[in-house]
Amino acid sequence: MAIDPHPPEGRLAEDRRLGAGRSDWSSWPTYEAAALGLPGSWWYPVMWSSQLGRKPVAEQLLGEQVVFVREAGRVFALNDRCPHRGVPLSLGTKEFPGTITCPYHGWTYDLDNGVLRAVITDGPDSPICGKVAVRTYPVAERLGLIWVFMGDGDGDPPPVDDAIPRELLEHDFAMGGNIETRHGGWRFGAENGYDEGHAKYLHRNSLWRLFRLMPTWTRTRVVPTDDGWITRVQTEVHWEADFPGLGTWSGRRWWKRGATSKMLGASPSKAAKADPAIASLDVPGNQSIRLPGLLRIVHSRFIHYEWYVPVDEDRYKYVQIMVEFKAGLAAQMFKLRYLLLFRWLFHGQFSAQDEWMVNVMDAPPERLYRPDVSITAWRRLCEQAPRNGQAVRKG
């Protein structure tokens, strides 16, 4: 079908009204190029510590194949490819202490430094030993998770504690969580998590919010806070809206708990019944995000965190944890509530609504609107990644 090179003015006006959207993310070049993760060096949570036993575990992270091995209680991570013929080392075995052996020809690598120590099929005097090595990655165990340091540069990485929210280092807490691989790419996952607009509509009928009223629309600003976070602060909260020529829309239902003036943009850390650990955060709003992709949602009694760890250009590891700052019997009661309730309602059905949208999202092109101030603030933060990465410390 031929295309009219001179469309009528009416059609041009219609095209301008609808908008063609952005052709790319060229306003955020670092972000646009970050399909496999932001530049710089970062600690990422990968799996539960309990998932790594005697057998090697293969993972793909930031487009790289990595094998995790536990030896004498310590975790190691190596590039999951034997340099000989490209066979995954994760298919191999531990024939000698402190090593992993390729299943094909018996090439055996040191877990600590990746150096080829022996070639079983070439005898003890194999001349290639010591001349070949696979890449190794720093690893650590914290919060019941295995963390890996993915980045470039020589020298020792910064402490893994630098990547963990300080409140989790300063207080006792009970925790529940979920890790799964999702489609859509880590950037869409992070944008969905920090997006101001979607929760009020997409999640209005979720079981997690079944008895709690959601606003219809809000006004929001984004402010930088401590430790590299940017925080959403609601300046206006509206529970219904009258749309001219259409009618009134409201999420009010007889069974939903009504809103009060104290709920209008209030900081959960300043709530009268806020947990002391949460009150000490003194955050201006309940939702924050920081590099390289860690979301924190603060409630008055608990905090939810989620990491978006790139797997490849289309997939990411979605790591969710929920914590209450409790000890003893109260901690055990939280764990029970998590297993019986929160795991299914929040980390399950509620989160599955987000997965649905992220999986079908197709942008750019895109046309942003006022609530997307949260998304553009996040993209601007990502542009600082080359300067703000968890840089390798020399010496």
Spans of features found by a protein language model:
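Alpha-helical structural elements
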Residues: 20-23, 38, 102, 224, ...
